[in-house]
Amino acid sequence: MNALIVFFSRADENYFGGAMKYVEVGNTEIAVGHIKELTGFDSFKLEMTNPYSADYMTCIEEAKAHLRENARPELKALPDSLDAYDSIILAYPNYWGTVPMAVFTFLDAFDFSGKTVYPLCTNEGSGLGKSVSDIKKYANVCEGLSLTGSTVAKAKPVIEKWLKNNHII
């Protein structure tokens, strides 16, 4: 398998099990670090040209507005090509029940014919939401993994099991 890890992650003020906490590295990026350690796969971070606010409450309102508008936020960059990869591990936080709209910007930019997407979603209790069904509009999707963001630092064994169950490692 030749896979690329593509991810969207947000640092700054985040919600952790009922409380706000400032983090320098987002939960999804921490999970991606575990995947990279376990697989050695390359990764690509999706970053918006105009990022969401560092303030959590403002961020969720901005994300909600993007969802309502079906926006496709401009990204600083996209991978040059996905041709060398047969699989994409797509990691993201659950924003309003689906992927962040910046992830849709990525999905819209490529043809996923012949590729398989493995979704990994960080959240604080909302699970995968409808993200898997939304991604299926673009690509063949295998079993996704929902991780509670506040526990992701210790989730390497769970991630390893998911990778093994999907025959990624």
Q: Where on the chain are the PLM-derived regions?
A:
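Short, well-ordered alpha-helix to beta-strand connector turns
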Residues: 85-86, 114, 139
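Short beta-strand elements in bilobed, periplasmic/extracellular small-molecule ligand-binding domains
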Residues: 42-44, 139-148
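Glycine-rich, charge-decorated loop segments at or immediately adjacent to ligand/cofactor-binding or catalytic sites
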Residues: 125-138
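Glycine-rich, N-terminal phosphate-binding loop of Rossmann-like dinucleotide-binding domains
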Residues: 92-93
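Short, conserved loop/helix-junction motifs that constitute active-site signature segments
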Residues: 82, 108-114
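N-terminal beta1-alpha1-beta2 submodule of the flavodoxin-like/Rossmannoid cofactor-binding fold
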Residues: 1-87, 97-98, 104, 157-169
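Short, charged, surface-exposed secondary-structure boundary motifs
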Residues: 129, 151-156
